[in-house]
């Protein structure tokens, strides 16, 4: 939940201090990181997903994109890869599987005028920043959850929607459910540590890269893993409450019902978009998006900016190139919050020797 209370910074030793926190590591967030570096701002990025790229990576990595200036055409994932390469010289930290939960004003250390912001994530990470730039696309992505009555009590222990630590699956019987790139990639990776991996999908075809599908079929043929066509029917457990453990998974298909012995279920059915906690940050919103001033792309709450699809204003165009423009202007205003006593010198990558050296010899 959000708060309007001005507060002293607790547990400073456990808090990351930087100039700007970028919420969202999709194309706009990645370009924003590059722009921050060009301006001399320190920044860190967080994303609710387990890797950079946002919708381009998670929903349509193979989709052709034709409206990026000077790029006649490229695949969505190729664009993400190029943006990662572009911002790599600045080596800004990226924190994945992190959802921005709350923001609070922090008492300034010195001048008593330019207050800073404390952002806390769902895992407890905290960031003490001069400004926040929200580049969260259509909102925070949340996993499509298993709709079986037994699932909620097992989530986080035996039912998972992301793989955050491969070692926890060592020696386990793992069922990976899904038919996209993430499901195939993790099934293939987990087969190297798990006692047995079964990939479960409702049909023979996949929405995944041909190479991954071929590798999976070869692994099945070699006896390294299993592939079952069907849908989740029930989760059978032992124990109760927090001591409940997954024992078996009931699979339903046209051929009937079968039961798989399983210790862990990794359900990778894709993502759904939701506004998330950001909608409760006491900013003016329009249809789930952040209303911004188009001269600075700052929200109604001082120090919080928005760029990309999450930003709302009259005649807003939901284009990646629009997000690039919005982020560039937002960071110029954010610079004044980070360095209130300094004037921003207009920087061009072509005529700044130090910057040019950094970008060409990274």
Curated annotation (Swiss-Prot):
Q: Does the keyword Oxidoreductase apply?
A: yes
- Give one GO term, molecular function aspect: NADP binding
Q: Which domain of life is it from?
A: Bacteria
Explain how, and how many, cofactor molecules are bound.
Binds 1 FAD per subunit.
Give the E.C. number(s): 1.18.1.2
Instruction: Please list the cofactors this protein needs.
Output: FAD
Which reaction does this chain catalyze?
A: 2 reduced [2Fe-2S]-[ferredoxin] + NADP(+) + H(+) = 2 oxidized [2Fe-2S]-[ferredoxin] + NADPH
Which SUPFAM superfamilies does the UniProt entry name for this protein?
FAD/NAD(P)-binding domain
Detail which positions bind FAD: 47, 55, 60, 100, 141, 309, 350
Q: What's in the keyword line of the UniProt record?
A: FAD, Flavoprotein, NADP, Oxidoreductase
Q: Which family does it belong to?
A: Belongs to the ferredoxin--NADP reductase type 2 family.
Instruction: Describe its partners and assembly state.
Output: Homodimer.
What protein is this chain from?
Ferredoxin--NADP reductase 1
The organism encoding this protein is: Cupriavidus pinatubonensis (strain JMP 134 / LMG 1197)
* Origin organism lineage: Bacteria, Pseudomonadati, Pseudomonadota, Betaproteobacteria, Burkholderiales
């Amino acid at each position: 939940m959000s708060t309007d209370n001005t507060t002293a910074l607790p547990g400073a030793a456990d808090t990351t201090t930087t100039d700007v926190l970028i919420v969202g590591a999709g194309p706009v967030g990645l370009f924003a990181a590059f722009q921050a570096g060009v301006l001399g701002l320190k920044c860190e990025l967080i994303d609710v997903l387990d890797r950079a790229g946002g919708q381009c990576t998670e929903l349509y990595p193979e989709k052709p994109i034709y409206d990026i200036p000077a790029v006649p055409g490229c695949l969505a994932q190729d664009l993400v890869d190029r943006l990662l390469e572009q911002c790599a010289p600045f080596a800004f930290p990226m924190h994945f599987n992190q959802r921005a939960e709350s923001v609070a004003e922090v008492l300034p250390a010195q001048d008593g005028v330019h207050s800073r912001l404390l952002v806390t994530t769902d895992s407890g990470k905290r960031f003490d920043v001069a400004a926040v730039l929200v580049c969260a696309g259509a909102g925070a992505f949340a996993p499509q959850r298993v709709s079986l009555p037994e699932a909620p009590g097992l989530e986080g222990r035996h039912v998972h929607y992301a793989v955050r630590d491969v070692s926890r699956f060592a020696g386990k019987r793992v069922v990976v459910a899904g038919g996209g790139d993430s499901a195939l990639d993790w099934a293939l990776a987990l087969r190297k540590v798990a006692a047995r991996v079964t990939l479960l999908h409702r049909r023979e075809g996949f929405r995944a890269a041909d190479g991954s599908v071929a590798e999976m079929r070869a692994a099945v043929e070699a006896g390294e893993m299993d592939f079952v066509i069907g849908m989740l029917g029930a989760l059978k457990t032992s124990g109760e409450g927090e001591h409940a453990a997954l024992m078996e998974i009931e699979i339903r298909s046209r051929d009937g019902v079968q039961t798989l012995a399983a210790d862990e279920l990794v359900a990778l059915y894709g993502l759904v978009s939701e506004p998330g906690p950001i909608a409760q940050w006491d900013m003016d919103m329009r249809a789930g998006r952040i209303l911004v001033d188009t001269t600075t792309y700052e929200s109604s709450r001082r120090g919080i900016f928005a760029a990309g699809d999450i930003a709302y204003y009259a005649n807003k165009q939901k284009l990646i190139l629009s997000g690039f423009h919005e982020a560039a202007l937002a960071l110029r205003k954010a610079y004044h919050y980070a360095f209130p006593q300094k004037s921003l010198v207009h920087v061009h990558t072509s005529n700044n020797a130090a910057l040019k050296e950094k970008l060409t010899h990274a």
